[in-house]
């Protein structure tokens, strides 16, 4: 069974995870949010009182993460048998302040890459989103999409996500956070965020979530037709 694999990449607050979750529900397939994996590790480090001054030391990280077991089950992420989604939401700001640093560390990227590729091997039908899926994690994906939107729209989406009061200070804080995240993601030395050469660019600035889901669904159906595949 060959299967059908979809890679979705894009910058912060481009709507990747929300859209991929809806598509996975529509197609009844596995959805893997790789950004969530980095958030889980970041939360694990915070809870285990990591010494951030030593975070770049590989031996220190290996020892600290030796008992960190991350896995997916029925589209939910677990760490050491605990479902993590709610706790990640509750500690969102604390995690946001450190996740870019954690995601830039070679040891952690390699650790999660092995996990991601194991998931890909064991799930013929899946949609995976992140920042290097089409370029590094799943370069042979059947369909690659680079999802983006202008920074003003992404800021607005993040404000709505946080249910912020939209005060001037809050807007500035979110704006600075997204701009800094963009800079780090596009310029990091290992697996920087970039569009795969064979990815379809989809700008969602002027379309809503449902319209985006429908456009991607149509792209999936078109690609499957080209591959002479009927089932999903």
Swiss-Prot record:
Its EC number is 2.7.4.25. Keywords: ATP-binding, Cytoplasm, Kinase, Nucleotide-binding, Transferase. ATP binds at residues 10-18. It catalyses: CMP + ATP = CDP + ADP; dCMP + ATP = dCDP + ADP. Signal peptide: none annotated. It is an enzyme of class 2 (transferase). GO terms for molecular function: ATP binding; CMP kinase activity; dCMP kinase activity. GO terms for cellular component: cytoplasm. It is found in: Cytoplasm. GO terms for biological process: pyrimidine nucleotide metabolic process. Belongs to the cytidylate kinase family. Type 1 subfamily. This is Cytidylate kinase. It comes from Phytoplasma mali (strain AT).
